[in-house]
Amino acid sequence: KGTFWVNNVNQYKRLAICGGIYSNYLALQQLLEKCKKLGVDTIFCLGDIGGFGPHPDRCFPLLRKGRVETIAGNYDISLAQERKDCDCGYTDPRDNYFAQASYNYTFAHTSKENKVWMKTLPSQQRFLLGNLKVLVCHGSPRQTNEFLWESSTPNHLLEKFAVDYKADVICCTHTGIKWHRTLAHNKHFINVGVVGRPNS
């Protein structure tokens, strides 16, 4: 595993990382335009392309044209596998009610072609940012729909992820709320937030 980081990963100097697009193609357009002006090497999207917004199929051409490196979120996996729900991981019945309504709409308005494309998405990706070993995923390195809240996630769990996955920086999304924590040995855990919904 030690040589994995040296021989088999891409290396970047400047990049952008975002979370859920949630069918908000207008927000995605703005992101792509801003990244072009900033001259980033590449853009990573950490999953959940569809959901909540009205036009999921308008996002996919933008992702492809922008050559956005996309990770599979729980929404993408469920749509690709034609599951009955989004596998969001909610425990509150009210959240599940609205999530189901959103998923049903997104499923009906996502083309077969795009569902097939989502089957090709990886669950995580590794790369070098300068000398830093970076791992990007959706929920956590161990589970796509794991909620890691800033208020309740202990340092020792995040530090264990850094050790187990040999990463200096781990980036995720899923909760939709951005936060950053510096850990022991100058490791970092970052929730990048989302593009397509308010930060709440």
Predicted features along the sequence, with ranges:
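Internal, conserved structured core segments that host functional sites
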Residues: 116-150
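Conserved beta-sheet core of the metallophosphoesterase superfamily
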Residues: 151-200
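Metal-dependent catalytic neighborhoods of phosphoester/phosphodiester hydrolases
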Residues: 27, 49-66, 79-91, 147, ...
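N-terminal active-site segment of His-dependent metallophosphoesterases
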Residues: 1-68
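Active-site neighborhood of divalent metal-dependent phosphoester bond hydrolases
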Residues: 66-126, 152-165
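Active-site neighborhood of phospho(di)ester-bond hydrolases with catalytic His/Asp-centered motifs
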Residues: 18-19, 43-48, 69-74, 137, ...
